UniProtKB/Swiss-Prot annotation:
Transmembrane segments: none annotated. Residues 204-224 are annotated as: Disordered. Part of the FGAM synthase complex composed of 1 PurL, 1 PurQ and 2 PurS subunits. The gene is purQ. Its EC number is 6.3.5.3, 3.5.1.2. It comes from Natronomonas pharaonis (strain ATCC 35678 / DSM 2160 / CIP 103997 / JCM 8858 / NBRC 14720 / NCIMB 2260 / Gabara). One of its GO terms (biological process) is 'de novo' IMP biosynthetic process. Residues 2-224 form the Glutamine amidotransferase type-1 domain. It catalyses: N(2)-formyl-N(1)-(5-phospho-beta-D-ribosyl)glycinamide + L-glutamine + ATP + H2O = 2-formamido-N(1)-(5-O-phospho-beta-D-ribosyl)acetamidine + L-glutamate + ADP + phosphate + H(+); L-glutamine + H2O = L-glutamate + NH4(+). Pfam families: GATase_5. The keyword Iron does not apply. One of its GO terms (molecular function) is glutaminase activity. Part of the phosphoribosylformylglycinamidine synthase complex involved in the purines biosynthetic pathway. Catalyzes the ATP-dependent conversion of formylglycinamide ribonucleotide (FGAR) and glutamine to yield formylglycinamidine ribonucleotide (FGAM) and glutamate. The FGAM synthase complex is composed of three subunits. PurQ produces an ammonia molecule by converting glutamine to glutamate. PurL transfers the ammonia molecule to FGAR to form FGAM in an ATP-dependent manner. This is Phosphoribosylformylglycinamidine synthase subunit PurQ.
Length: 224
């Protein structure tokens, strides 16, 4: 398997993602967005950063790059696609997943560890965990507040497409444990196909034992 890690102008987490995947013995290649996806691509990761300086809206310009047509085609074919942080914003702007990511409730950039509760452990991105398990991963964003219409959120919940919620260390989903004001504490969701997921927290930054917790490894295992 070769995971294509898409680099846009302003991406800054592509190397982190490459190293985290290599640690798990998952082949990955950083791909410049103008070059398109390699023929041997069997997975796609859209990493974090500030694509195009977050002008207009975070992820809005990158979502309209030609390579995203290839990504949507891969998603329709069931190829694993993961968007992290700015990649999640690009994914939502590019209609890979519902909802939108807007300015944090605090109106400031936040970089801190958070707790996530696994809401559905029967997806490629969460099968390494148990339902209700609490993991710790970092966030680093200024526009990470998940917003969605009430009826669309109800559909996501009914279809078990919410995969992570912000919680406290004991797994309680509360407003106090919500770092950015995301609706219903949502931190990660699936697209129409369970092979497509986006989340604001950074699993690749919690995957290497020499720098900290490794709770994020299970998410990246979804590329196997």
């Amino acid at each position: 398997m070769t995971v294509a890690i898409i680099r846009f102008g302003g991406s800054n987490c592509d190397r982190d993602a490459e190293r985290a995947l290599a640690h798990l013995d998952i082949d990955a290649e950083i791909v410049w967005h103008e070059d398109g996806l390699p023929e041997e691509t069997t997975g796609v990761m859209i990493p974090g950063g500030f694509s195009y300086g977050d002008y207009l809206r975070a992820g809005a310009m990158a979502a309209r790059a030609p390579i995203m047509d290839d990504v949507r085609e891969q998603a329709e074919a069931g190829v694993p696609v993961l968007g992290v942080c700015n990649g999640a914003q690009i994914g939502s702007e590019g209609d890979l997943t519902p909802g939108a990511f807007t300015t944090n409730r605090s109106a400031r950039f936040q970089c801190e560890p958070v707790y996530l509760r696994v809401e559905n452990a029967e997806t490629p991105w969460t099968e390494a965990y148990e339902d209700g398990e609490v993991i710790e991963v970092p966030i680093a964003h200024g526009e990470g507040r998940f917003e969605i219409a009430d009826d669309e959120l109800e559909t996501l919940v009914d279809e078990d497409r919410v995969i992570f919620r912000y919680c406290d260390a004991d797994g309680n989903v509360t407003d106090a444990a919500n770092p950015n004001g995301s609706k219903d504490n949502v931190a990660g969701v699936l697209g129409e196909h369970e092979s497509v997921a986006v989340l604001m927290p950074h699993p690749e930054r919690a995957s290497l034992p020499d720098i900290g917790p490794t709770d994020g490894q299970g998410v990246l295992e979804g590329f196997r």
